[in-house]
């Protein structure tokens, strides 16, 4: 197998009560696992098997046309979720260089959270909300489906899955409540690590 489902860096119930155990189990073991299985099927026998998922997603135009859609959807799904799990933590602490940079750009962490939440809530249908580094500056963007900002040359350092499968069992159609809960489990240490790696 070229690509594998990563283990969660915490227990399924570690993010309770914000992200519930049942959703985490289904999201990781079924949804993410399906992306990995379909991605492996799509790239089997191609030179993509030896490339990193980041390299593939950043260079989607070079993926053969007959498998490009499958790789975009499932490769994006694998990359996005692999990053998402690492960006969550039961020990969320708002500190680091990136937090200072956010305050510098948005005026306050609360203003940043408001803009991020507004854009995440406004993302029509399925997709993701991201904090990215673009030419040295922070920027909030959203992507449809399983698209990743790397495809546009932007480096994601924080991401939130706003597909219904990420929150429907607990929050039903109340996406803003799910987005609000997200701030309680952000792994700012990982966000800071990703931000500093772009310098």
UniProtKB/Swiss-Prot annotation:
Function: Destroys superoxide anion radicals which are normally produced within the cells and which are toxic to biological systems. May play a role in maintaining cell viability throughout all stages of growth, but may be the major SOD activity in the exponential growth-phase. Has a role in resisting external superoxide stress. Involved in acid tolerance and the acid-adaptive response. Mediates the derepression of perR regulon in the response to HOCl stress when the level of SOD activity is low.
Note: According to PubMed:10383955 the levels of SodA activity and sodA expression are growth-phase dependent, occurring most during post-exponential phase. This response was also dependent on the level of aeration, with highest activity and expression occurring under high aeration.
EC number: 1.15.1.1
Molecular function GO labels: metal ion binding; superoxide dismutase activity
Biological process according to GO: removal of superoxide radicals
GO cellular component: cytoplasm
Annotated source species: Staphylococcus aureus (strain NCTC 8325 / PS 47)
Quaternary organization: Homodimer. Can also form a heterodimer with SodM.
UniProt name for this protein: Superoxide dismutase [Mn] 1
Record keywords: Manganese, Metal-binding, Oxidoreductase, Stress response
Keyword NADP: no
Binding site for Mn(2+): 27, 81, 161, 165
The gene coding this protein: sodA
Family the UniProt entry places it in: Belongs to the iron/manganese superoxide dismutase family.
Co-factor(s): Mn(2+)
Taxonomic superkingdom: Bacteria
Record's catalysed reaction(s): 2 superoxide + 2 H(+) = H2O2 + O2
Signal sequence residues: none
Enzyme class, broadest EC rank: oxidoreductase
Up-regulation conditions: Transcriptionally induced by internally generated superoxide stress in a manganese-dependent way. The presence of manganese increases SodA homodimer activity and simultaneously decreases SodM homodimer activity. This occurs primarily due to post-transcriptional effects, since the expression of the gene is independent of manganese availability in the absence of superoxide generating compounds.
Cofactor binding notes: Binds 1 Mn(2+) ion per subunit.
């Amino acid at each position: 197998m070229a690509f594998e489902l990563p283990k969660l860096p915490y227990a399924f119930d570690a993010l309770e009560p914000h992200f519930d155990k049942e959703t985490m189990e289904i999201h990781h073991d079924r949804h993410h696992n399906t992306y990995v299985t379909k991605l492996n099927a799509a790239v089997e026998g191609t030179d993509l098997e030896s490339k990193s998922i980041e390299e593939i997603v950043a260079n989607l135009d070079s993926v053969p046309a007959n498998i490009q859609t499958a790789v975009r959807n499932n490769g994006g799904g694998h990359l996005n979720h692999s990053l998402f799990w690492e960006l969550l933590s039961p020990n969320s602490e708002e500190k680091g260089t990136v937090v200072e940079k956010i305050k510098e750009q948005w005026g306050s962490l609360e203003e940043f959270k408001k803009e991020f939440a507004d854009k995440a809530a406004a993302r029509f249908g399925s997709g993701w909300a991201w904090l990215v580094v673009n030419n040295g500056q922070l920027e909030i963007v959203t992507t449809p489906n399983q698209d990743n900002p790397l495809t546009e040359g932007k480096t994601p350092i924080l991401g939130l899955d706003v597909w219904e499968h990420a929150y429907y069992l607990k929050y039903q159609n109340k996406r803003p409540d799910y987005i609000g809960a997200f701030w309680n489990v952000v792994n700012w240490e990982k966000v800071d690590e990703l931000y500093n790696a772009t310098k």
